[in-house]
Amino acid sequence: MSLKILIAPNAFKGSLDAVKAAQAIQQGLEHSALHPHCTLQPIADGGDGMLEVMLAQTESKKVYAEVEDPLGRSVKAAYGLIQNGKTAVIEMAEASGLRLLIPEERDPRKTSTFGTGQLVKAALDQGVSEIVVGVGGSATVDGGLGIIQALGGILTDEQGNPVPRGANGLSVLHSLDTSQLDSRLQTCRITVACDVTNTLVGAAEVFGPQKGASPELVAEIERHFLRYSQLVKSHLRKDITYLPRGGAAGGVAAALYAFLNADLVNGTEYLLAKTGFQAALNQSDLLITTEGALDVQTQSGKGPFYVAQQSKKQGKPVIMLVGSVPKDYSPADYQDYDAIFPIGPRPQSLSEAMQYTAENLERTAYQLGNLLAIKKP
């Protein structure tokens, strides 16, 4: 009887999305001596790749809209319609993602979430009753001001002028007026799939540098976030200062909670619940997952850690295929995985490794299949 393997990979950031990673592993296993029965269950945590994972595993339709990128340029962004068009799935990175900018353009003072707000509006035009927003992979630290502006919120400075885009808007924000927000939001449920648990205050220090913020700018944005949370508390009667997950995507999660009454959820758990992961796991003998770079963050609730925990609860073995392992690797730190295999064939540069991720995954899965096919004497 064929071994039943559940393939639940995470994306290799900047190299290979989770859907293609799953297909590469399947190819390798099926060409091996093992000849297993494979079920593909790619995972995401709310960040880059969430949309493709949802579309690949549900009855869905991909829709496009012309919106603004983080710097206000026109970009064609995709979103999905699932559940017979009743629910829209928006990946924030499609409109406001770091991947849309070259390194020299990363400047949180100017980058805005306005385009994501336009995607929300486009989804409302489709008549949906629920919108799921995956908020990872953003280029922004604007506290979600751009989204609120795109949806009709009036955010002004001390002179009554609209605040500028980006974190520059946070620096002069004085008044919040929600009276002109799109009225359709009142009957639409908003769910935010978060990839981190960080709070609003403290988020700039953690995520600002990767989005182009200098240490001085990080400290400045932290002060603005604190003042912003005080404004929200006085205007909207909601405390977002230390709201769990509120710091996701530079404060977008906190804004959607405060202005749109959104529910903030663990992105991985939400996606797996929607795509039937538990049922697939119940029918499997073994789980294979992946991670680009294995490190301590892998164990902080990220997708691979979550699926590994679920598998171990059922007493099923877990194999992890990784792009790299840390120099200070210790098996004691990764006890949820029965075996960890680096996929690199030889010492190579990061750019070369990223170029051949699919090939490396397929080859490693092929050898893994041959290993699993060896019969005990």
Predicted regions and their residues:
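N-terminal loops that bind phosphate or other acidic moieties
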Residues: 2-135, 139-377
